[in-house]
Curated annotation (Swiss-Prot):
This is DNA polymerase IV. Its cofactor is Mg(2+). The gene is dinB. Poorly processive, error-prone DNA polymerase involved in untargeted mutagenesis. Copies undamaged DNA at stalled replication forks, which arise in vivo from mismatched or misaligned primer ends. These misaligned primers can be extended by PolIV. Exhibits no 3'-5' exonuclease (proofreading) activity. May be involved in translesional synthesis, in conjunction with the beta clamp from PolIII. The active site is at residue 117. It comes from Streptococcus pyogenes serotype M4 (strain MGAS10750). It is an enzyme of class 2 (transferase).
Length: 364
């Protein structure tokens, strides 16, 4: 017996776009000499004493088992000839803006998930094109011609299937999952490929003898709810290709922040304040990009021994002014108890966000 009826909206046309090895691809585009070589975006461990983690890497590096969040030291051990690049995040942000402009050419119903990934609802698009596959191909064409980068596209009737489809054939792939093919498509997938199913849930599912979408399809809804609570309700529907979550072009952001981890520990106040300034300016720029203002400034400090402190100050009025954010974050730091251990991470975050109103001018 179902807790809730199975309502499956198959009328939508949704594309999930995922840029291929984005940061590394931008570096290859700007330096053709890197093509065909393993490229890792991360600090060279030979220069940092082994510290640092991989942000991303190109497909050549992935052949050696290198992946995001791996330590740079391990990445080097797996592939000593890998080329390590610290990364230029302002450049990546500029390219990300170009990418979003291409999406908006076809529809305003765009939900960015990160700088290199977005859902695009083209059910009612600006060009009146009926085929979502055609629009996906046009986006891929525009991306290559105008930005010099490739992307993979997944086309289906909901976000869940679109995301899985874009991962199915990379790089520069295009996969279509029709409603009549959804069950077959999902049945063959390992459960760990299901978007939104985390590592602990995968382990629990494996303990239940569930390894594939086909296995999951056979489990009664109440059994899944007994084991996973509310998430069991979602699992039951995902196994059937049901996910009615809308593409939210106005996703509500609860916070905007910037933080950096340092290969060399920070000890000097001048260095610390300089890094707080960089983070504050980054936050101000992001607030401007997202047309947001905020009231609460949060400073995060992580020391060499991994002790982490966060402290916040709420302002009387909304702001996105870089100098003000920097001043408040600096004052927060001054109020912390002295700690002789060096600092390995600093972060500045703005919360209590509201949309920018026309009569407030608080630009950089």
């Amino acid at each position: 017996m179902l807790i809730f009826p199975l309502i499956n909206d198959t009328s939508r046309k949704i594309i999930h776009i995922d840029m291929d090895a984005f940061f590394a691809a931008v570096e290859e585009r700007d330096n053709p000499a890197l093509k065909g070589k393993p490229v890792v975006i991360g600090k060279d461990p030979r220069e940092t004493g082994g510290r640092g983690v991989v942000s991303t890497c190109n497909y050549e590096a992935r052949k050696y088992g290198i992946h995001s969040a791996m330590s740079c030291k391990e990445a080097y051990e797996r592939c000593p000839k890998a080329i390590f690049i610290s990364g230029n995040y302002e450049k990546y942000r500029t390219v990300g803006d170009q990418i979003r402009r291409i999406f908006k050419r076809y529809t305003d119903v765009v939900e960015p998930m990160s700088i290199d990934e977005a859902y695009v609802d083209v059910t009612n698009n600006k060009l009146g094109i009926k085929s979502a596959v055609k629009i996906a191909k046009l986006i891929q064409h525009d991306m290559w011609k105008e930005v010099g980068l490739t992307c993979s596209a997944g086309v289906s009737y909901n976000k869940f299937l679109g995301k899985l489809a874009s991962d199915f054939e990379k790089p520069h792939g295009l996969t279509l999952v029709l409603k009549e093919d959804a069950l077959c498509f999902l049945a063959k997938l390992p459960i760990e490929k299901f978007h939104g199913v985390g590592k602990k849930s995968v382990e629990k599912l494996h303990d239940m003898g569930i390894y594939t979408g086909q296995d999951l399809l056979a489990v009664p809804e109440m059994t899944l709810i007994d084991h996973f609570g509310r998430f069991g309700f979602d699992l039951y529907r995902k196994a059937r290709g049901i996910s009615n979550s809308p593409v939210k072009s106005d996703r509500i952001r609860k916070s905007i922040g910037s933080e950096r981890t340092y290969a060399k520990l920070l000890y000097q106040e001048t260095d610390i304040k300089a890094e707080i300034s960089k983070n504050a300016k980054r936050v101000a720029a992001l607030l401007q990009d997202h047309k947001k203002l905020g009231k609460t400034i949060v400073l995060k400090v992580r020391y060499a021994d991994f002790t982490t402190l966060t402290k916040r100050v709420t302002l009387p009025e909304l702001t996105r002014n870089a100098a003000q954010i920097e001043q408040v974050a600096g004052d927060i730091f001054d109020s912390l108890s002295e700690n002789p251990a060096g600092i390995r991470l600093l972060g500045v975050t703005m919360t209590n966000l509201e949309d920018k109103v026309a009569d407030i001018s608080l630009d950089l």
